[in-house]
């Protein structure tokens, strides 16, 4: 099966199904080995594998930030946009912010530019003097810090809006003025349109999505939200921000609203669970109630896949679980 037979729907299916298939296979193998150890012959599985599932392997990236993300812009990416990211993924040369020319040896099959939903595009708009954000109290304050090269003050205030416990400015940042919804609507539509312009069925899949950046007491509960659909459905919504709620159950409810209203499909990918101090898989919900069957069913409905590894760490295991693992 070729990538031309997949596009957004097929790749979305692969992303959702891949981890589940691995987990089921591992479980079956472990059960069989256990039965053999107990002296019981395992039963033969007479089921015939289906030929309808995609069997190709495709390479891409589901977590990358452009200058629209607060951290990316603050850490030095002042000019590279989602457009540059898509061009780079498709094998085109781009100029990095260092002035170097960068180009992949082999193009990717798909890409999602998952900018942070929280203050999406705000710092870039302030410095670019667009949308009038630079004339607000927030804009004037951040612009002043930027011109003083006090980037840390901007980051502290931004992180404080996500989690006061992990920011030096603490609760003060919780009262920060937030740009109007109309601003984020415009930024999001531009993001969706950009993905659509680069989406090339049969050659390259450009997903629309974002990162929901929840933190509680400094523990990372981030999710990457991935839409299967094009702008005819995704442009009518705006990214869900953890400033609205840091509870993943709130995010899942909003994703359900999207599917019910548009008939589209979306999933959430837990990101950097290795930085969650175990909270990503806690037996207690954010509300304080214990995890139950209904919660588990809801979570697997919206989060069928888990990010296993990336440059900021691995989430496959833990030193307490695998003390002999050298890696």
Language-model-detected regions and their locations in the chain:
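Bacterial N-terminal signal peptides
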Residues: 10-22
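Extended, charged catalytic domains and RNA/DNA-binding interfaces, predominantly
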Residues: 26-327
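N-terminal secretory signal peptides that target proteins for export/translocation
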Residues: 1-8
């Amino acid at each position: 099966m070729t990538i031309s037979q997949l596009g957004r729907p097929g790749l979305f299916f692969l992303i959702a199904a891949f981890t589940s298939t691995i987990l089921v296979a591992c479980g079956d193998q472990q059960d069989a080995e256990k039965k053999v150890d107990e002296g019981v012959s395992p039963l033969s599985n007479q089921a015939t594998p289906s030929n309808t599932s995609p069997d190709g392997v495709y390479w891409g990236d589901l977590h990358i930030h452009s200058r629209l993300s607060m951290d990316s812009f603050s850490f030095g990416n002042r000019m590279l946009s989602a457009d540059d990211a898509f061009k780079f993924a498709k094998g085109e040369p781009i100029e990095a912010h260092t002035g170097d020319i960068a180009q992949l040896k082999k193009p990717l099959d798909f890409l999602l530019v998952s900018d942070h939903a929280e203050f999406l595009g705000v710092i870039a708009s302030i410095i670019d003097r667009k949308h009038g954000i630079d004339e607000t109290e927030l804009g004037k304050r951040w612009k002043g810090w930027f011109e003083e090269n006090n980037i840390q003050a901007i980051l502290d205030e931004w992180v404080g809006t996500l989690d006061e416990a992990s920011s030096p400015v603490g609760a003060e940042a919780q009262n920060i003025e937030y740009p109007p919804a109309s601003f984020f609507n415009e930024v999001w539509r531009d993001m969706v349109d950009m993905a659509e312009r680069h989406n090339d069925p049969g050659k390259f899949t450009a997903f629309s999505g974002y990162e929901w950046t929840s933190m509680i007491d400094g523990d990372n509960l981030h999710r990457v939200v991935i839409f299967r659909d094009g702008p005819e459905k995704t442009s009518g919504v705006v990214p869900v921000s953890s400033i609205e709620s840091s509870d993943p159950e709130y995010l899942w409810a909003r994703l359900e609203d999207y599917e019910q209203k548009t008939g589209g499909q979306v999933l959430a990918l837990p990101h950097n669970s290795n930085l969650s101090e175990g909270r990503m898989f806690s037996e207690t919900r954010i509300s304080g109630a214990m995890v139950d069957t209904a919660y588990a069913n809801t979570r697997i409905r919206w989060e069928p896949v888990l990010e296993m590894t990336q440059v900021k760490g691995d989430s496959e295991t833990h030193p307490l679980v695998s003390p002999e693992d050298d890696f």
